[in-house]
Amino acid sequence: MKKSPEKITLGLLQHPCGPDPEANFATVLAATRAAAADGAQVICTQELFRTEYFCQSENHDIFGLSEPVPGPTTEVFQALARELGV
């Protein structure tokens, strides 16, 4: 007999981004904590959550906004995921 898949609660984060990457990051971290407190087991952010959406055209001047993976943002999320158990 087939086993039913386990139910998983998702937290899907979407927010407007302003010009301050650190303020955007703080918003996402707070929303991540709130989603975990509401029972989310897997939490997904929107793409480019630290910056305003700039992908309307290819602009090499803003390529410096990218980060390596692993890098500073993923390290913070790894620690937060461990702390929250998500």
What are these regions (language model features)?
Residues K7-P19:
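Active-site-proximal beta-strand elements of phosphoester/diester hydrolases
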Residues N24:
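Substrate/cofactor-recognition hotspot
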Residues K3, Q14, N59-H60:
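Generic signal for short, ordered secondary-structure residues
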